[in-house]
Structure formats: C-alpha cells, structure tokens
Amino acid sequence: MSSITEIISHAIYDAGAKVVTNVPGIGGTEVFAAFCEISSQNHPRSFHEEVAYTIAHGASLAGERSATLIKAHGLAKAANSVVDSLSAGTTAGFVVLVFDDRLSRHSDCIFNVPALLQGLEIPYRRLQLHDTYRQIQDAFTWSESLQLPVAVLIDTDDLGKLETYTPLQRAVSSHNYKRNVIQHVVGPFFPEYQRKVLEAKLSGESWQMIKTPTPPTIPDSLPDVLQQIVRLYAPLFSVFKRLRGDIVTGDTSTSTIFASPPYNCVDICTYIGGSIPLAIGACLAGYKNTWALTGDFSFMAAGHLGLIEAIQRNIPLKILIFNNEKAQATGGQPVPTGILDRILTGYEPYVRQIHKPQDTNEIETVLQEASQVQDMRIVVADYRGG
C-alpha cells in the first residue's frame, strides 16, 4: 500500500512530465518532495504561483509535458496567467494539481475553490479515492486531447490515505513545438478567434474548421498611432530578426506587435510581465536559445519575478527590455525615473545597454554579444527620448 502523496508523485513522473513547478504550501510541498526523490533531482521551488504556472505553461507550449503543484489560494494568485493560457492553448499535456485545504488548517481562509475553477473556465476534475494513479495519468492525456491546461482538485485531507496501484512504464513526450502566432500570441489582434477556439474546445466541438484570421502586416495594416511605434522600434527589430533565438516570448505590450510579418519576431505571448517565465519554460523544455521581450512597465509589474527563477535555475536567458519610462500599451502612463535601474542593480553583471536604438551598428554589437555568450543577458534599449 502507498499513500496518495506517493501515488500522485509517481503518476506525474511516469506520465513523463519534464517540467514540474511548485510553490510551498500544504499538499503540494509533500507531493513535490516525493517527485524530486523519485526523479533523483533537486528541482527548485518557485516563489510566486503566477510565475510557477507560467513556467510550466511555457514548457507545455514548447512540447514537453508539465505540471504545477499549488494550493488553491495560489491558483487565485496565478489567475491572470491561467485565463490567458486558456486562450493560448497548449502543445503537450499541462496539468495543474490544486490542493484544497478545505478547513483552512494551513491557509488564509476558507473559500469556494470549485467556484474559482469554474469562473476561470479551466477544465477540472476532483480526485476520487480510487485508482488515483490512473486519474493523474489520464489528466495529461485529457489536456492533450483538449489542447488546454487542465486542473485536478485534491483534498489535502486525503493525501495520507492508502491505496494500491500498478505503475506504468515512463512515457516519452512526442509533441513538437510549431510556431502559431494566431493561437499562441494572446493580445488585441486575435481575441475573437481565440475565444471561439476556446469555447469549441470546452464544449467538445471541432475547432480546426474555425476560420483563422490573417496576421496584420506591419506597419501598413496598423492604426496611425501604432505605426509611429513601429517606426521607432523598426531599426532594432530589423537587426533582432536576424539574431533571434529558437523561441521568442513577449508581453501584451507594444513590442509584441512585431510578432507579425515581415518581422516575425515574437512567437508566444500571454500576460503583461509573462515573457520571462514563458521563456524559462521553453528553455527547460530544451530550447536553450530563447529570448524574452518586455517593456519597462511590464518588467516592473511582474516580469522581474521571473528573473529570480532564471537565476536559481542557472538559465542563460536573453532578455530585451524596451525602456521608454511609460506604460505604452495602456495609454502612455509615466513610469517614475530610476525604478528600473534600481531593480536591475542586483543583476548588474548581466546588464548591457543599447544607448542609441536607432543606431543599427550599436544594436548589432550588443545583440550579437548577448546571443553568443553562455550566460544570462539583460539588454536595455533606451527609448526614453522617443
């Protein structure tokens, strides 16, 4: 006989999950520790549930099975990434194990967790106390059949109970990443299409026949205000498109406009500040030459949380920050001078500056160095005068 904790951890491992994240909390901590022991690896724990969720989602989009182990309260913290991940979809199976401390013995408060899951619209099942191993295994195939993240709701009071199970041979992922910006770039360009696809997936209908929109050609297909931004950023992207990595992640910020032709410089995008954890997930899935693009506001709002994860995992991530001291995507609200520099002080050895982002020679020199080194690089392009 084995405990439910042990069975869940074995099921995750045997399902072939390559990237498994966890933020400490009742239930998830115990299962994660057991998973680390089974896999003979000391996987790092994450500090923030939105980041942990997004890392796993990035790995799934890049073609590797993944899982996130978090408390129900943590799912609430990750909600922005959750709803955007449903619009972006998945490639390989992505299972979110949500641990429900129903009586709040180790949590902030008691709340209606099923209502949260239903409101987020993430497909979920409650773990039943029979054939636990199969239920966790099936969750990965369910995710892959829907091409969506799915959740399994687990009562923490059940984790010490005992069951028998028959282990299966460890699965090998056979999913390959394919660039698809119409599906994977969440933002103002394709929301109606992505919503129709999501509704079809949730209702069990065929979504492949839904008419796909045509990506805008930049700058000609854009409103005048966006054309001005494109002209400002065009010299940098004319160089970046030649040096870009295997996967480039973006934020829902103005730089993600360059996902469209003829630049094709962004591949995946979910929420503001999500580019860095998405890129970490892609790196962990095997795409080592990965770039994350972000605006200064997006980076300060949430992106910097991902830097901690990249450092503790020793990932040689490449990050490009567009520093214009404003929240350009939401109307140009000013960002106080000096805050970006203060945040980056702790990462000074990795920081490189593009002082004149209209000078293609300087751009080429800085980006070339960043792309070639086997270390993290944080490139800051100075658009404060633009």
Predicted regions: what they are:
Residues 1, 5, 24-28, 49, ...:
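Generic structural signal for well-ordered, non-membrane alpha-helical segments
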Residues 1-18, 123-254, 354-386:
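Flexible, low-complexity linker and terminal segments
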Residues 16-20, 41-42, 247, 266:
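Short active-site oxyanion
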Residues 17, 245, 287, 315, ...:
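A structural motif
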Residues 26-119, 123-125, 131-144, ...:
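Thiamine diphosphate
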Residues 111-114, 167-170, 262-266, 308, ...:
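Short secondary-structure boundary/capping segments
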Residues 169-179, 267-274, 335-347:
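Acidic, Ser/Thr-rich peripheral helices and adjacent loops at domain boundaries
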